Amino acid sequence: TLLASSAASDVYKRQSIRRQSEGIYAMFHYLNYEQKYKRHHPDWEQRLKKMLDMFLQLQNPDGSFPRKFHDDFTVVDGSGGSTPSATLPLVMGYKYFKDKRYLSAARRTAEYLEKELISKADYFSSTLDANCEDKEASLYTATATYYLSLITNGTEHNHYASLTRKAAYFALSWYYVWDVPFAPGQMLGDIGLKTRGWGNVSVENNHIDVFIFEFADVLRWLSKEYNEPRFSDFAEVISTSMCQLLPYKGHMCGVIKVGYYPEVIQHTNWDYGRNGKGYYNDMFAPGWTVASLWELLTPGRTENILLK
């Protein structure tokens, strides 16, 4: 089967194309790292091949992937908003295994993205829980077409680059270019948080977070590709701003332990039922925040793999 979800909630018991994609993506980064030191893992290579082959079975005729499904591939949620998350491991699989089937599948995802998301400016349902317009769909779409532009040439490269620019502009509309005011006594204001450079999550989840991963790299690449310094300038704003809440001795930012980074940063009066504006929600997933910042702080990872 594909990678199993470990969360207890029923919404997470169903398989998610994004969760599976991110797991495969992480393993490709691991295998590429190991290759540099002449270490090989044929067992993991076979597992990844098997999983990517299952991706090929799961892909719809229009190039999309269902958002959620069961182990037997019966579809639970046929929404295609999570499709771009699958593009990344497909491109990496093509590069690693030299299997053109994976590149063909990745190209088909781009056809779907262009027709249903980019041309309509309708980026939806990429997050694991919310079912609405969200930042992550446009961010993932920009990243997906960025991957394809890196491994193609000529007219095809230019086309994917153009799609990347369009999706990136939309993704940037979720990011703050001003600092939300906080009242005296609200923790986020008292510690001096500046919201400029942070992204709102979605229509349903109205808080800011550090979901960025490779998007800063995408912006820097676009800046060079189109000689447009605004992209790299804002990547720098994001990079500096999102490190504000990293806890260390003497700068714990309301976090009790070093090594944790809050997920739900409540910058509005949107009612989550916990703590309110100016505070963290005490229900949060600590893992992905660290992974996102790790990628932000290690620029060039994908280009080092796809362009070598």
Question: What residues fall within each predicted segment?
Answer:
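Solvent-exposed loop and edge beta-strand segments that line ligand/cofactor-binding
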Residues: 10-24, 37, 67-85, 122-143, ...
